[in-house]
Amino acid sequence: MIETDRLIVPTAVGPQEEQIERALRPRTLAEYVGQAKAREQLEIFIHAARKRSEALDHVLLFGPPGLGKTTLAHIIAREMGVNLRQTSGPVLERAGDLAALLTNLEPHDVLFIDEIHRLSPVVEEVLYPALEDFQIDIMIGEGPAARSVKLDLPPFTLVGATTRAGMLTNPLRDRFGIVARLEFYSAEELGYIVHRSAGLLQMNLDEAGALEIARRSRGTPRIANRLLRRVRDYAEVKAGGEATGAVADAALVMLDVDRAGLDVMDRKLLGAVVEKFMGGPVGLDNLAAAIGEERDTIEDVLEPYLIQQGYLQRTPRGRVATPLAYRHLGIATPASDAELF
């Protein structure tokens, strides 16, 4: 699978990386870099909730993977001075799984559900009254003797995170009082994050090295920190531990991450659209078959950055390569395509 062998995939690739991420994670909103709009809103809402001694309204965080949704959930709990209970949509298979979590919450605690779009309908039905009225219905007994018992819950905050907000049901989406979309980071913001992480890793990294890593990190802090660790390895072996701009560039070229932040899979996808399908439009199923990947992987992992950077367009008829894609691949843009753009 692409997630396990791709250096610039935005999802976490294992327990070891998750452990490193936790060590590098900012602990407060003051330390959190980027997402200025979401950060400002959360600062105000958290301050107001604490001033009134209330639970924070339920929060929905959505956007591409690796942008800091889990980090923000931890920060929200820390800023509120409460406990955080963490789970994910696929883990909550039965209504009882959710009920066990909810009944163990303390007042104002934060319950973080990652991949909340993957909750089962049965679990969602239990969640609705919990979010709205802080109550749940529990079935006691079995068969004809079974009866429903209503349990009161302490006021709590649900923080839901998703990469696919469009898959949330309307009733669930409507129960979030605070909705924040996380955007890709600028090179300057990522440079600051890389510098901070380098300090925590006790690594010698100059400004040019940080910028070289930042501009190849696809606007994603998780990728930036991963590339930083690989540059550190290269610098320690090849450059006496000094990660300059030239050293970072050499390390990333060795890793097949080009100066636009594209890797072999990105170039393979763009090459397929340009060379096998004459620039498009090409349907998603045909494209998936051409490069040997699942359509969900293309939609969720490969496409977002290519579209955001202007290499690819998604049209009603299929995917179309832009002149920028042709230039990046070193292929002349057909005259008919050049006229379209």
Curated annotation (Swiss-Prot):
GO terms for molecular function: ATP binding; ATP hydrolysis activity; four-way junction DNA binding; four-way junction helicase activity. Mg(2+) binds at T70. SMART domains: AAA (SM00382). Residues 259-341 are annotated as: Head domain (RuvB-H). Coiled coil: none annotated. One of its GO terms (cellular component) is Holliday junction resolvase complex. It is found in: Cytoplasm. Keywords: ATP-binding, Cytoplasm, DNA damage, DNA recombination, DNA repair, DNA-binding, Hydrolase, Nucleotide-binding. SUPFAM superfamilies: P-loop containing nucleoside triphosphate hydrolases, Winged helix' DNA-binding domain. Residues 186-256 are annotated as: Small ATPAse domain (RuvB-S). DNA binds at R295, R314, R319. GO terms for biological process: DNA recombination; DNA repair. It catalyses: ATP + H2O = ADP + phosphate + H(+). ATP binds at L24, R25, G66, K69, T70, T71, E132, D133, F134, R175, Y185, R222. Residues 4-185 are annotated as: Large ATPase domain (RuvB-L). Belongs to the RuvB family. Has 3 domains, the large (RuvB-L) and small ATPase (RuvB-S) domains and the C-terminal head (RuvB-H) domain. The head domain binds DNA, while the ATPase domains jointly bind ATP, ADP or are empty depending on the state of the subunit in the translocation cycle. During a single DNA translocation step the structure of each domain remains the same, but their relative positions change. Homohexamer. Forms an RuvA(8)-RuvB(12)-Holliday junction (HJ) complex. HJ DNA is sandwiched between 2 RuvA tetramers; dsDNA enters through RuvA and exits via RuvB. An RuvB hexamer assembles on each DNA strand where it exits the tetramer. Each RuvB hexamer is contacted by two RuvA subunits (via domain III) on 2 adjacent RuvB subunits; this complex drives branch migration. In the full resolvosome a probable DNA-RuvA(4)-RuvB(12)-RuvC(2) complex forms which resolves the HJ. The RuvA-RuvB-RuvC complex processes Holliday junction (HJ) DNA during genetic recombination and DNA repair, while the RuvA-RuvB complex plays an important role in the rescue of blocked DNA replication forks via replication fork reversal (RFR). RuvA specifically binds to HJ cruciform DNA, conferring on it an open structure. The RuvB hexamer acts as an ATP-dependent pump, pulling dsDNA into and through the RuvAB complex. RuvB forms 2 homohexamers on either side of HJ DNA bound by 1 or 2 RuvA tetramers; 4 subunits per hexamer contact DNA at a time. This is Holliday junction branch migration complex subunit RuvB. It comes from Thiobacillus denitrificans (strain ATCC 25259 / T1).
